[in-house]
Amino acid sequence: KVASITPVVVDAETTSLILGITIMYDSSSTTYTADQITSLVSTTVSNYSASDLQTFNTPFRHSKLLGLIDGTDTSILNSVATVTMAKLFTPTLSTATDYRINFNNKFYNPHSGHNASAGGIIASTGFYLNSVTTTTYFFDDDGVGNLRIYSLVAGVRTYLNNAAGTVDYTNGLVTVGSITITGVAEVDGIISTQIRITAIPNSYDITPVRNQILEIDLTNTTYNGSVDATTSTGV
């Protein structure tokens, strides 16, 4: 008798990568403007995301993408790209709930208390508490492993809770302690039911784990094309 095999369907869990790309190019060797160069590069990035990512077990290779960007046009001399990881989670409204947002990649934390005064390396889109929509709250971290909740008052971070959860920098895990979220602010100017959490990785090479799939966030990735000063001045 042959034992039957029951397939297990695993839901994909997407981690988005928000890139900040700067391209230096030689204006004397092309008829393209800076905007046209960045448009070409954006197509390269989109093609890379579609061909090399968006499936299981396909890592993001930072150096490979930079090589593709540099090869987009012969006038491009070099490029740099920062990487921020992002995940969405859907809060259970008006019910005390805790949440685990697992990036499965180590977070950047070069020393205890890193960047605490400016919000650490964790950020989020907005949400509401106590059914009050006149005050928007956000998450950040203190660089020592505490997740914080704050609002902006005259542009200054004002903290409601300095211990709203934990940040595990080594394992890339954000844990939100029991919280009653009553509403969600817009995400990218669009009405949303989800909150986006972002984190700066320790390495720009990102590896998916288990059911994790990587993709580039083409909406929030930014491009800056600049004429290389050396080629334009000869100095």
List each model region and its residues.
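Surface-exposed interaction regions enriched in Ser/Thr/Asp/Glu
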Residues: 143-145, 152-235
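Structural flexibility/helix-modulation signal
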Residues: 114-160
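Flexible glycine-/small-residue-rich
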Residues: 21-27, 103-105, 199-201
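Short, well-structured beta-strand/strand-turn elements
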Residues: 72-87
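A glycine-rich phosphate-binding loop feature that marks nucleotide/adenosyl-phosphate handling sites
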Residues: 10-18, 58-67, 84-91
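Carbohydrate-recognition loop of C-type lectin domains
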Residues: 1-52, 56
